[in-house]
Structure formats: structure tokens, C-alpha cells
């Protein structure tokens, strides 16, 4: 199998914050670029196996650690506005485009990263060729009481660092080794979800139907039907609202939130890789 070589780089993000990103370069001539956004509390390194699978198909991978995450600068998991994440991601897409101007660009996001990629894609629809979302946080307010939504919005604006919600690490995967590694990873944030990020995701969910109308590029959404962190209902709603005529939702029975880290990960990665290659 073709392997990819990983290298570390950085750029100045919004407000001058140092953003660290990795590039996985396949050993053969690349035929496409995947620009990847990880989820809340984690980091790009958790996608090494994903990048290797894509590399075997001749795909370059660019993946950043969001501000306040992993190796990047900024206060831990602190966010004032979703646009900070979106514009940092856009900078990375621009770097990939400058490095490889003739290659098609696929943008991919998981969970919160899926929300970031969705928001980016809706705002800048002409900058990429296709989009892949994994368990995307595009409907985070669904099922939350109006009172809690209002509280999160106020706190998120006035005191974005205040912790408001615990996330269940056992819900990321059915694989106990994945869960154990997640819990032991020093670059994963193990505290509560802060109000700033909660506010950003709630606002994104409330504006999702309007934003979705701007998505015209091919879209693949993958989701586990036993995802307790980001229920699949949001993905179903998203694919019904996008303007694109090339939309596919793949729901995997029994899988939890991180479909790339489930025991069935080979099946999922093969499906996603095949779809990407078919859209180059």
C-alpha cells in the first residue's frame, strides 16, 4: 500500500494566533487534496490513519489543529465567534490551493469540524470541489430547551470560557481501545464544553437551513445511527435543505460518533475514499 509522509507547518490565524497544521504527502503523484477539520477538544493527529488511507488513493491531506486545540495557540477551547474557526480553515484551504493549484480540493469536517466546514462552504462556495461531513454539528440546538439555549447564548457572549456541558468520552466509539486512547491523550481537552463554543454551535444550527441553500457542490454526509453526541437527525435535515443536486447521506447502523474510529472503520474509510475519488 502507498504510504504518506507527514510534515508539520504553521501559519498566523485570525488575530495572529499561531495555527499548526500537518500535511500528509503520498509517495505517488497526488491527484487531489483533502483539507480536514477535526472535532471539538481533539486534534489533527487523531486522523493519521485517515490520512494514510486517503494517501493510498493518491490524496494529499492538510489538517489543522483549531485555535485553542492541540499544538495551536490560543486559550484552550476558547472561542469568541465561529468566524475565527471558519477563517482559519479558509486560510488552510488557501495554502493547499497555493501549494497545488491544479488539484481538486475536497473539504472534510468531523463533528464540530463538520459545522466549521459547513459554515465555510456556505460562505465560500466557489473555493472547493466537494464536501464530506462526518457526524456534523449542524443542528446542535435540537432537543435543547429554549431556556438553556438562551442561557448559552448570553454566557457565550459575556463569558465564553465558562464551562457549561460535560461530554461523554465513552460515546465516541464502541472500540474500548479508542476510548482509552482518547481519555489518555494529553492533547485532547477533557474538561467541559465552554459557553463560547456552545453559543457558536447553537447559532450555526439555528441558521443551518438558510446556509444550506448556498451549498451547491457535491456533498457526502456519513453518520452513525447510534451517535449520542450528535444525533443523526441533524444530518437528515441538512441533506434535505442543501441546494446541491449531488447529495448522499450514508448512515451506518450501530455506529457511534467517530465513524472513522469504530470497529467498522475500514468500511467507512473505503466508502468515503471511493466517493472522493469519484468526484475528482
UniProtKB/Swiss-Prot annotation:
Predominant location category: secreted
Catalytic function, reaction form: Hydrolyzes glycerol monoesters of long-chain fatty acids
Assigned GO CC terms: extracellular region; plasma membrane
Classification via Gene3D superfamilies: alpha/beta hydrolase
UniProt-annotated location(s): Secreted, Cell wall
Keyword Nucleus listed: no
GO biological process: fatty acid biosynthetic process; lipid catabolic process
Activity dependence on pH, as recorded: Optimum pH is 8. Highly stable from pH 6.5 to 9.0, and still shows a residual activity of 50% after 1 hour of incubation at pH 4.0.
Pfam family of the protein (one): Hydrolase_4
Keywords: Cell wall, Fatty acid biosynthesis, Fatty acid metabolism, Hydrolase, Lipid biosynthesis, Lipid degradation, Lipid metabolism, Secreted
Phenotype reported upon loss of the gene: Disruption of the gene affects the morphology of the colony and impairs growth in the presence of monoolein. Cells lacking this gene are more sensitive to rifampicin and more resistant to isoniazid.
GO MF annotations, alphabetized: monoacylglycerol lipase activity
Similarity field: Belongs to the AB hydrolase superfamily.
Function text: Contributes to cell growth, probably by hydrolyzing exogenous lipids. Catalyzes the hydrolysis of monoacylglycerols (MAG) with fatty acid chains ranging from C14 to C18, with a maximum activity on monoolein. Is unable to hydrolyze long-chain diacylglycerol (DAG).
Name used for this protein in its record: Monoacylglycerol lipase
Organism: Mycolicibacterium smegmatis (strain ATCC 700084 / mc(2)155) (Mycobacterium smegmatis)
Amino acid at each position: 500500500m502507498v504510504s504518506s509522509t507527514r510534515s508539520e507547518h504553521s501559519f498566523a490565524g485570525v488575530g495572529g494566533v499561531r495555527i499548526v497544521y500537518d500535511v500528509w504527502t503520498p509517495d505517488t503523484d497526488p491527484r487531489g487534496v483533502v483539507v480536514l477539520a477535526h472535532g471539538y477538544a481533539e486534534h489533527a493527529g487523531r486522523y493519521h490513519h485517515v490520512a494514510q488511507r486517503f494517501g493510498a488513493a493518491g490524496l494529499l491531506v492538510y489538517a489543522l489543529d483549531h485555535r485553542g486545540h492541540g499544538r495551536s495557540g490560543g486559550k484552550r477551547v476558547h472561542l469568541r465567534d465561529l468566524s475565527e474557526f471558519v477563517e482559519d480553515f479558509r486560510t488552510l484551504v488557501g495554502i493547499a490551493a497555493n501549494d497545488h493549484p491544479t488539484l481538486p480540493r475536497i473539504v472534510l469536517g468531523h463533528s464540530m469540524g463538520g459545522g466549521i466546514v459547513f459554515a465555510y462552504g456556505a460562505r465560500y462556495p466557489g473555493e472547493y470541489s466537494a464536501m464530506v461531513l462526518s457526524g456534523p454539528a449542524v443542528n446542535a440546538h435540537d432537543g435543547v430547551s429554549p431556556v438553556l439555549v438562551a442561557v448559552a447564548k448570553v454566557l457565550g457572549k459575556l463569558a465564553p470560557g465558562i464551562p457549561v456541558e460535560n461530554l461523554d468520552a465513552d460515546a465516541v466509539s464502541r472500540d474500548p481501545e479508542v476510548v482509552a486512547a482518547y481519555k489518555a491523550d494529553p492533547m485532547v481537552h477533557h474538561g467541559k464544553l465552554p459557553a463560547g463554543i456552545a453559543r457558536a454551535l447553537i447559532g450555526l444550527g439555528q441558521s443551518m437551513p438558510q446556509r444550506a441553500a448556498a451549498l451547491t457542490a457535491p456533498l457526502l454526509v456519513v453518520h452513525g445511527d447510534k451517535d449520542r453526541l450528535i444525533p443523526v437527525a441533524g444530518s437528515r435535515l441538512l441533506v434535505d435543505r442543501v441546494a446541491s443536486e449531488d447529495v448522499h447521506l450514508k448512515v451506518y447502523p450501530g455506529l457511534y460518533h467517530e465513524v472513522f474510529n469504530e470497529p467498522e472503520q475500514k468500511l467507512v474509510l473505503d466508502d468515503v475514499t471511493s466517493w472522493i475519488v469519484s468526484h475528482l
